[in-house]
């Protein structure tokens, strides 16, 4: 069993036994005590051989066994499952697993050649293997010792400069500097925005009209009165007969509408045309269409804020942003720490693995490859890297993709900060510029008056505002609640109309007048029966404009089809009201003024309208018909112009008038109110002029503004001065990028990109010694993020070079026997050198291109950490190189230090120092495990190589060849190289020569068989030839294994870099002899291996010692038996046989071949070359006629075939008569009939019949001119087919169940009979033909092509039937009524129709409808399905009752999809484009609606949606409108001008995205939730009454998340507002108890508008952003940074504001907001303040770095408490009877006080109280203590402080009270007066008390010498001569005026 072949057990190690024959099983018990042994034998191994860990290969089965716990375990190889050779060949993936052994396989490949013995003869490189095994590697092992120092390299990881990268993050603060630019007063500007609402007040004037509007609301009801007028039209209906006057109606102006510019031939002079796409209104004059106006309201008003845009000046500050960019990298540095994981990431580089191909250079390790042969398998390892593809490794160059580190550049996403340039839009931030207005605000306390302008809005309530009514109305009309009174007015209106109604009677004649367009008014959507086609209808509640069109957008359609049962089917599309546009522009704020609409009550007078009964007088209405004329002009209409009922449009204002009783009455402004959205226009002010930001210096003027308390904010303007620097930013257009820097904050997101920076952390890679883990590093492949390559620096791990130990895996190369292919892989071993490749991380430098990010490079310093990648290098060995791309970043050459890794060979060497330990080299025997070391290539484990004591790992030193990676060393530029110093460790190795013992390891080589696995990878770039590793591993020539199946011949690998000549290892089994390695030291001549299969010819290795002549190959197997030879030539004719007996049963012709025999009972045998049947009894074959000739009228006698019920009847057949065929018969001919069941009938039928009357028959033929092809009734299971023309019929009989009918019919019919269940009719029907199943044909199918008024249908009540087909040219496809569960699959074009009849429950339509065609689902077709496309003015219609149904359809090119009737639990999936219109009516409970509207497509849901789900997409000016939804889920996407407008929504959820001017807005909303994303000028929100709802989302790029609903109580709005976007509560009335929170950045705004009482706003405001509430009892708090603002608006009494304000930020209440409270922290030029005139308010907080805590001007009775730092901060109380407590305080109001250090007081009756303490005795003997007193004058200040000479800057006087407390317990109280007159100071101590001394303590103590001296123009001093130290306390009372 045990076959000790030459390759079986060959050991050169003295401690191992070398078996050379098969008889020594008993001596095999312990072949080698220190290492596992490999046995090769035939059959299952005996349990008596081997020891724990030994391997046994059954040469017969190629199954490996491992001895575990005394038992041979099958299929275990080095703790891995082994595969069968075929498996290996068949599953390259498994190869991947064993890739470790794969390297051996590499040898195997060459080994194949070894099998050739050719190279084997060359001295059996195995001898060289001997060297490999021992000493050579041992030498390398010595170097390994230094490798131990490599571990110190791990300490290098501590050197993580990456941490410094964190400092780079500080650079991010630089970004904040960018924000500083925004810091411009722009924040105050936001208050200026409040001023903008003042402008809205202007609109309020219109609002006055709004008051009327309120009436208008009532008026709307009044409009209903108008509807009453329509009632008159109804009367006209009665009079309609008189239509003659209607002709005059024709004279009336028609309003036409369409999509696009009107056609010149459309309409007549005086007509109007409305372009539904643009809302442009045209009038026809002299035959030409002239644009008159645009019905859309203007939004422009808000553009005023655009003025604010000027603040862009501060944008200049953006220059700092440039610095910030560096900061970004700093951030990345932090992530760099994470980079440690990045080590794995290095493998991520491997992800580039093609790049690893570069590691393929490691292929140089291939020299190890001599071991490398195993290395070939290693190539598999490459596969691990996919390295075989290592050439792909060149892709490794792609590894430059590692540049993904460039992703760090993604940090450049900070560049998105460049988007921050959009930050330049931040210039829109110029809205902050509004802040500039805010600067005015500075003055703008007065500006606050602007806020009063808001009060002006109250003015809006003024009736005068009424003019605005019409525009703003409607929405504000919500206020129209008062308008309810107006409702009475409505009645009045009706009355008026009613009178006209009388005229309406004549209007009846006006029916012709209908040609004139009527404009109707009403509340809510129009009733379907209201108005005529062409009329317009205005919903006064929503200002929605509807037009009445017929269902097909043209004439009514009437389609009829004649069915075989003569049933008439009529389809008619009646006029439908289609929403055209909304006359109102954005509902402007002015709507608020609409409140005054109460006056609308005057409409009550309209009550007389109840006289509508007079409508009979409507005859006069005939004239009224003319009244329908629409006039237009500029300005108000002339009283003499027009007649009652006429309409007049003022083209200047858009005001619409109606003439009533001879007076022009304004009714509505067809132009919508200018919406508040105009405010966004402010953003438009991009104020790119922001460069004017230099004007920010005007902010300095803001200092002047200080006169205005807000002027303090002007101080912030000083920062604006920095903005001047920002002007440099102008230069810095790049600086603008700096602006991006602002966004750069977001750029922090970029940090993710910075992950590349993580590479920096890679420096931690120094830990690379951990590289042992590098194995895991392979997982790192995912780490491609590592590509950020900065990580590449990890190259430091180069120490992994130790991994070279893995080279020991080369031992596996023995297995290489199998992997002959592996030879090429040898080069792959050089890949080991790839470890140096870690330097390849330099490739990271490629990232430097990213450096464009600039600052980020700074982070690169962190990159030194990247050395970690070095660990990877081990792994890579193939693809790690890909990291090179990263190199650019890493330039740190330090990585080259990785080359030191070559020293790794020395791995063992470290222990070598212990030379004595070399004995441990025995452990090296374990080195065989080193084979696993190949896995070690992952390198990090290589560090474990230190255990190199096992010396065998020293063999891994071969891996040192990885030094090749050094090519990548480019990255090494990083200087981190220092890690390289570790390399020096190599020197120590020299001692380690002991290692030679390791050579024994060769035994492992057996595993090499596995090597076959590695398909020869693509030839990787030839890695730099690594240090020639000790070749020895190749050494032990394994016993020549049983000649394995010739391993899959891998691709011939590139000739591996010839590894260093290894120590002469034990002569390995010859098989390994694959690649001829460098000629190693001549090893012991190995046993002559069995001649292996001839491998591919390997690269010619250095000529090895001449190997033993291989054994003669086995004799080939006997070839398979050859193919049967060709048939031999025919033999000679045999002799004629004897004459036989004469036969009586056979007749033979003289030719000997023609014969007839009847020798067998019952059979006649004929042998002849031809046959004839004669018709005459004389047997002559020459007689005519031919029995088959038509002239044969007597037929052919077939009686001989007349078997009972046989195939043919008895008798003669003629050519024209084949009738009456019996049962089981067949008939062929003309006009044929078969009567027998199971018959077959074929024929040609001219106006007659081809038929079968029996079951299971088949009938076919041609029927023409009324001919019939059929099976008769009862012919179940029959088939009828053919061609039926000119009224021909192809049919089965009635009740012919399971039958089939098919064919072609032109004007004919193809049908199954009635009741023909489970039947099928198919074919083509043309020219009025019919393809159908009969009525009641359950489970039947009809399919075909219907053209030319033809019909494809199932019969009535044909349940579960199916129709499939195509209908064209008025073709019809339909299922009959009651055809439940039927199915139609069809296409209809050219005015064709596809229909499911009434009551077709559970049916389905799948079809295409084009060119004016119709798809229709009949009423009560519940549970049905329609999947269809409606195109080119076609229509898809359902009637009522399609509950539980599903409609999936597309409407295109003005196609119409209309769903009417209640649909419960149904599903609708639509796409409406190119003017397509989808309308869903009635109620849809529990349904699902999914749709997309594009290119002016419209989806309208008219009915209520209860518990319904709607998902829609609207783009390109398209829209989705939903009337009412309860408990529903509405989701939509509105882009490119698209809109998604749910109507009344209660308890519903609305989610969506609005982009590119898209709009998602709901109307009345209660208890709903609106969620979404608004981008690029889009809007998301609610615009009508709303209660208890929630809006949340993300708004970017001038977008808005809003609620501009009236009465939005108890609601919540939340989200993220960025880049001039707004999260906005724009409720005009009673928006109480709302909650607003979010994040606002880059001029973003979070705002609760006016009258939001009890509101709560909170969040973060950055970069000229603001968080605002306006309403009593509100609360606002958050974080305000970079000129951002947190505040409440004007007149917001009793509010609470708090937070943190930084970098010019402001926390404030609005002006005139008494009893408010402000608290917070103010830093870097920020403000915490109340607004002006905020009486009885409080401010408290902390202010530092030139920040301010103050009450506003004239904020009487207020309190300011806090702490201010010493750098010029100010804590002030600016109103009367106010109080300031803290440091650097001011009490600037009369009767106020300030207490604290550096206190100020400057008004009558005020005081400042201050104290100080001086341990140096400020008033000791001989010293003077200066008391600084700043004089008093109205508006100035008094200061008491411990400064230099006290002065009074202004003329005036005051009393000073001082208490001096001495250190000895004495005290002195004194008083004096100081006066300044004309710049000269005098001091006047009072006479009483004497000298000003008020008292002494203790009493009786002598008064110290005291002098108070005026210093002329310098102030005054107090001199106290005493030996004590004094503490002083001062009070000053000011008396001057």
Swiss-Prot record:
Q: Which GO terms describe its cellular component?
A: virion component
Where would I find the Collagen-like domain in this sequence?
102-161, 168-227, 297-356, 363-422, 453-512, 672-731, 735-854, 867-926, 936-995, 1023-1142
UniProt biased composition (Basic and acidic residues): 296-514, 584-605, 614-625, 670-899, 907-1141
Provide the taxonomic classification. Viruses, Varidnaviria, Bamfordvirae, Nucleocytoviricota, Megaviricetes
Instruction: Name the keywords, alphabetized.
Output: Collagen, Glycoprotein, Hydroxylation, Repeat, Virion
Q: What does this protein do?
A: May participate in the formation of a layer of cross-linked glycosylated fibrils at the viral surface thus giving it a hairy-like appearance.
Q: Which protein is depicted?
A: Collagen-like protein 7
Region Disordered: which residues?
88-248, 294-531, 583-643, 670-1144
Q: How is it modified after translation?
A: May be hydroxylated on lysine by the viral-encoded procollagen-lysine,2-oxoglutarate 5-dioxygenase.
One Pfam match: Collagen
Annotated glycosylation sites: 6, 21, 515, 902, 1178, 1192, 1212, 1217, 1245-1246, 1255, 1317, 1422, 1427, 1432, 1443, 1452, 1477, 1494, 1506, 1513, 1533, 1598, 1619-1620, 1632, 1641, 1663-1664, 1672, 1682-1683, 1732, 1735, 1746, 1756, 1784, 1842, 1934
**Where does the protein end up?**
Virion
């Amino acid at each position: 069993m045990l076959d000790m072949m030459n390759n079986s057990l060959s050991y050169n190690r003295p401690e191992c036994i070398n078996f050379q024959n098969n008889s020594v099983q008993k001596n095999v018990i312990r072949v080698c005590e220190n290492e596992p042994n490999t046995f090769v034998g035939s059959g299952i191994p005996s349990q008596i051989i081997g020891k724990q860990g030994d391997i046994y290969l059954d040469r017969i089965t190629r199954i490996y066994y491992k001895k575990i716990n005394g038992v041979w375990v099958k299929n275990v190889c080095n703790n891995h499952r082994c595969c069968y050779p075929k498996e290996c060949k068949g599953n390259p993936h498994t190869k991947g697993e064993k890739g470790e052994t794969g390297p051996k396989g590499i040898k195997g490949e060459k080994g194949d050649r070894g099998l050739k013995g050719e190279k084997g003869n060359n001295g059996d490189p195995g001898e060289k293997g001997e060297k490999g095994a021992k000493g050579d590697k041992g030498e390398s092992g010595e170097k390994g010792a230094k490798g131990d120092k490599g571990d110190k390299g791990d300490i290098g990881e501590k050197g993580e400069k990456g941490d410094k990268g964190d400092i780079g993050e500080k650079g991010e603060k630089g970004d904040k500097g960018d924000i500083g630019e925004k810091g411009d007063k722009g924040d105050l500007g936001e208050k200026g925005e409040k001023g903008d609402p003042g402008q809205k007040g202007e609109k309020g004037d219109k609002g006055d009209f709004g008051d009327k509007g309120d009436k208008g609301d009532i008026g709307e009801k009044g409009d209903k009165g108008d509807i009453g007028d329509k009632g008159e039209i109804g009367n006209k209906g009665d009079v309609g007969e008189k239509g003659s006057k209607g002709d005059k109606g024709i004279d009336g102006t028609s309003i036409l509408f369409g999509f696009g510019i009107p056609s010149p031939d459309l309409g007549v002079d005086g007509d109007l045309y409305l372009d539904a796409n643009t809302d442009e209104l045209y009038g026809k004059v002299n035959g030409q269409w002239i644009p008159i106006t645009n019905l859309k309201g203007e939004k422009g008003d808000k553009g005023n804020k655009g003025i604010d845009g000027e603040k862009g000046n501060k944008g200049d500050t953006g220059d700092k942003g440039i610095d910030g960019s560096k900061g970004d990298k700093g951030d990345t540095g932090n992530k760099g720490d994470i980079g440690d994981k990045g080590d794995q990431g290095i493998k991520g580089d491997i992800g580039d693995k093609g790049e690893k191909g570069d590691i393929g250079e490691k292929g140089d390790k291939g020299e190890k490859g001599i071991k490398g042969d195993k290395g070939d398998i290693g190539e598999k390892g490459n596969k691990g890297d996919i390295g075989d593809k290592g050439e792909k490794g060149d892709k490794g160059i792609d590894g430059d993709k590692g540049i993904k580190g460039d992703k760090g550049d993604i940090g450049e996403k900070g560049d998105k900060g460049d988007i921050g340039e959009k930050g330049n839009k931040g210039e829109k931030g110029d809205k902050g510029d509004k802040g500039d207005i805010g600067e005015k605000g500075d003055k703008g306390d007065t500006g606050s008056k602007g806020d009063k302008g808001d009060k002006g809005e109250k003015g809006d309530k003024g009736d005068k505002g009424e003019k605005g009514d019409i525009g703003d109305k409607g929405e504000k009309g919500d206020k129209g609640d008062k308008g309810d009174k107006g409702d009475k007015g409505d009645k009045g209106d009706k009355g008026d109309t009613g009178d006209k109604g009388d005229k309406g009677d004549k209007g009846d004649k006006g029916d012709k007048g209908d040609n004139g367009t009527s404009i109707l008014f009403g509340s809510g959507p129009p009733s379907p029966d209201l108005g005529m086609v062409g009329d317009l209808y205005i919903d006064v509640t929503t200002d929605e404009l509807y037009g009445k069109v017929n269902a097909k957008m043209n004439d009514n359609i009437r389609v009829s089809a004649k069915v075989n049962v003569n049933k008439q089917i009529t389809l008619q599309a009646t006029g439908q009201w289609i929403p055209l546009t909304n006359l109102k522009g954005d509902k402007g704020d002015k709507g608020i003024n609409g409140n005054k609409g109460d006056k609308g009550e005057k409409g009550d007078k309209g009550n007389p309208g109840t006289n509508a009964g007079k409508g009979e007088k409507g005859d006069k209405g005939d004239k009224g018909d003319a009244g329908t004329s629409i006039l237009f002009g500029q300005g108000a209409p002339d009283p003499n112009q027009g007649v009652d009922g006429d309409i007049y449009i003022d083209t200047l204002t858009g005001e619409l008038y109606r003439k009533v009783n001879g007076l022009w009455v304004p009714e509505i402004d067809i132009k919508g109110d200018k919406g508040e959205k105009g405010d966004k226009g402010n953003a438009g002010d991009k104020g790119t002029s922001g460069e004017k930001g230099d004007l920010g210096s005007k902010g300095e003027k803001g200092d002047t503004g200080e006169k205005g308390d807000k002027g303090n904010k002007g101080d912030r303007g000083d920062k604006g001065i920095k903005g001047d620097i920002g002007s440099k930013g102008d230069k810095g257009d790049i600086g603008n990028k700096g602006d991006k820097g602002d966004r750069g904050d977001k750029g922090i997101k970029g940090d993710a990109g910075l992950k590349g920076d993580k590479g920096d952390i890679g420096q931690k890679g120094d830990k690379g010694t951990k590289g042992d883990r590098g194995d895991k590093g392979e997982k790192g492949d995912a780490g491609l993020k590592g590509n950020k390559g900065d990580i590449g620096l990890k190259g430091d791990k180069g120490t992994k070079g130790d991994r070279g130990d893995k080279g020991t895996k080369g031992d596996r190369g023995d297995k290489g026997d199998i992997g002959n292919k592996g030879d090429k892989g040898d080069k792959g071993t050089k890949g080991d050198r790839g470890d140096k490749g870690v330097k390849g991380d330099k490739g990271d430098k490629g990232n430097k291109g990213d450096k464009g990010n600039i600052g980020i490079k700074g982070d690169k310093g962190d990159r030194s950490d990247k050395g970690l990648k070095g660990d990877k290098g081990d792994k890579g060995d193939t693809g790690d190189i890909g990291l090179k791309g990263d190199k650019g970043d890493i330039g740190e050459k330090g990585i080259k230090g990785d080359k030191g890794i070559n020293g790794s060979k020395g791995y063992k060497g470290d222990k070598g120092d212990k030379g004595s330990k070399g004995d441990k080299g025995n452990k090296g025997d374990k080195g065989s495990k080193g084979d696993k070391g190949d896995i070690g290539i992952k390198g990090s484990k290589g560090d474990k190589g230190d255990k190199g004591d096992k010396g065998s790992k020293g063999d891994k030193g071969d891996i040192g060849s990885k030094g090749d990676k050094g090519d990548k060393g480019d990255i090494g530029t990083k200087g981190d190289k220092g890690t390289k110093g570790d390399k020096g460790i190599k020197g120590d190795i020299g001692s380690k020569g002991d290692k030679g013992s390791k050579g024994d390891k060769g035994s492992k080589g057996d595993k090499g068989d596995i090597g076959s696995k590695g398909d020869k990878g693509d030839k990787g770039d030839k890695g730099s030839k690594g240090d020639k590793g000790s070749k020895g591993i190749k050494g032990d020539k394994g016993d020549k294994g049983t000649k394995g199946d010739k391993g899959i011949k891998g691709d011939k690998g590139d000739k591996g870099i010839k590894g260093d000549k290894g120590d002469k290892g034990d002569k390995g089994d010859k098989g390994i002899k694959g690649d001829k390695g460098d000629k190693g030291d001549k090893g012991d001549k190995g046993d002559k291996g069995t001649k292996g299969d001839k491998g591919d010819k390997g690269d010619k290795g250095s000529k090895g010692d001449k190997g033993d002549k291989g054994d003669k190959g086995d004799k080939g197997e006997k070839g398979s038996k050859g193919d049967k030879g060709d048939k031999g030539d025919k033999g000679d004719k045999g002799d004629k046989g004897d004459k036989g007996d004469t036969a009586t049963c056979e007749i033979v012709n003289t030719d000997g071949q023609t014969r007839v025999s009847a020798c067998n009972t019952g059979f006649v045998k004929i042998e002849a070359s031809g046959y004839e049947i004669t018709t005459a009894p004389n047997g002559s074959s020459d007689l005519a006629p031919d029995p088959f000739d038509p002239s044969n009228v007597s037929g052919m006698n077939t009686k001989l075939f007349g078997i009972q019920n046989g195939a043919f009847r008895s008798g003669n057949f003629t050519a024209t008569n084949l009738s009456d065929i019996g049962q089981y018969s067949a008939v062929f001919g003309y006009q044929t009939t078969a009567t027998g069941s199971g018959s077959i009938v074929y024929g040609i039928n001219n106006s007659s019949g081809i038929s079968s009357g029996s079951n299971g028959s088949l009938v076919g033929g041609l029927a023409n001119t009324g001919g019939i092809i059929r099976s008769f009734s009862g012919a179940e299971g029959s088939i009828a087919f053919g061609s039926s023309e000119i009224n021909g019929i192809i049919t089965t009989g009635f009740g012919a169940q399971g039958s089939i009918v098919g064919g072609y019919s032109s004007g004919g019919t193809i049908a199954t009979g009635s009741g023909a269940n489970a039947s099928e009719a198919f074919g083509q029907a043309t020219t009025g033909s019919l393809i159908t199943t009969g009525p009641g044909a359950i489970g039947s199918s009809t399919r075909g092509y219907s053209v030319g008024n033809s019909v494809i249908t199932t019969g009535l009540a044909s349940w579960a039937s199916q129709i499939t087909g195509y209908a064209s040219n008025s073709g019809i496809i339909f299922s009959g009524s009651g055809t439940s569960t039927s199915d139609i699959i069809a296409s209809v074009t050219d005015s064709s129709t596809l229909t499911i009849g009434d009551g077709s429950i559970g049916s389905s339509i799948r079809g295409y409808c084009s060119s004016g065609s119709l798809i229709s689902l009949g009423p009560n077709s519940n549970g049905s399905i329609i999947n269809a496309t409606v195109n080119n003015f076609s229509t898809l219609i359902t009637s009522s009752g399609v509950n539980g149904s599903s409609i999936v359809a597309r409407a295109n090119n003005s196609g119409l999809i209309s769903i009417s009737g209640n649909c419960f639990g149904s599903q609708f999936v639509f796409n409406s484009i190119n003017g397509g219109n989808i309308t869903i009516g009635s109620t849809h409970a529990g349904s699902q609606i999914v749709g997309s509207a594009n290119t002016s497509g419209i989806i309208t849901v008219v009915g209520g949606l209860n518990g319904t789900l709607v998902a829609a997409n609207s783009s390109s000016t398209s829209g989705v409108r939903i009337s009412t939804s309860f408990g529903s889920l509405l989701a939509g996407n509105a882009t490119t001008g698209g809109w998604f407008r749910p109507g009344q929504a209660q308890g519903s959820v609305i989610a969506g995205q609005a982009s590119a001017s898209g709009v998602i807005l709901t109307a009345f909303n209660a208890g709903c939730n609106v969620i979404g994303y608004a981008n690029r000028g889009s809007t998301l929100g609610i615009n009508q009454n709303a209660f208890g709802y929630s809006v949340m989302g993300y708004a970017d790029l001038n977008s808005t998340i809003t609620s501009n609903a009236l009465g939005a109580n108890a609601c919540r709005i939340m989200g993220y507002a960025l880049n001039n976007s707004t999260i906005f509560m724009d409720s005009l009335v009673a928006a109480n108890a709302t909650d607003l929170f979010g994040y606002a950045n880059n001029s973003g705004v979070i705002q609760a508008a006016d009258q939001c009482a009890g509101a709560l706003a909170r969040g973060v405001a950055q970069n000229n952003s603001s968080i605002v509430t306006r309403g009593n009892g509100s609360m606002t708090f958050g974080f305000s940074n970079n000129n951002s603002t947190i505040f409440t608006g004007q007149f917001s009494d009793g509010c609470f504001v708090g937070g943190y304000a930084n970098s010019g930020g402001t926390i404030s209440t609005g002006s005139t907001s008494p009893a408010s409270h402000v608290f917070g922290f103010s830093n870097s030029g920020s403000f915490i303040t109340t607004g002006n005139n905020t009486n009885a308010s409080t401010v408290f907080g902390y202010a530092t770095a030139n920040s301010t805590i103050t009450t506003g001007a004239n904020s009487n009775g207020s309190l300011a408490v806090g702490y201010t730092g010493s750098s010029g901060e100010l804590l002030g109380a600016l109103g009367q009877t106010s109080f300031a407590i803290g440091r650097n305080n001011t009490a600037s109001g009369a009767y106020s006080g300030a207490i604290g250090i550096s206190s100020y007081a400057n008004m009558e009756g005020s005081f400042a109280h201050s104290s100080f303490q001086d341990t140096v005795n400020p008033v000791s003997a001989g010293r003077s203590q200066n008391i600084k007193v700043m004089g008093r004058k109205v508006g100035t200040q008094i200061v008491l402080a411990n400064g230099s000479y006290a002065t009074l800057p202004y003329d005036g006087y005051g009393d000073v009270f001082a208490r001096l407390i001495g250190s000895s317990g004495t005290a002195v109280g004194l008083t004096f007066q100081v006066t300044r007159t004309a710049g000269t100071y005098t001091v006047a101590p009072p006479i009483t008390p004497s000298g000003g001394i008020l008292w002494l303590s203790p009493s009786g103590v002598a008064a110290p010498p005291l002098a108070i001296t005026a210093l002329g123009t310098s102030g005054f001093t107090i001199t106290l001569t005493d030996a004590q130290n004094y503490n002083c306390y001062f009070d000053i009372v000011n008396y001057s005026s």
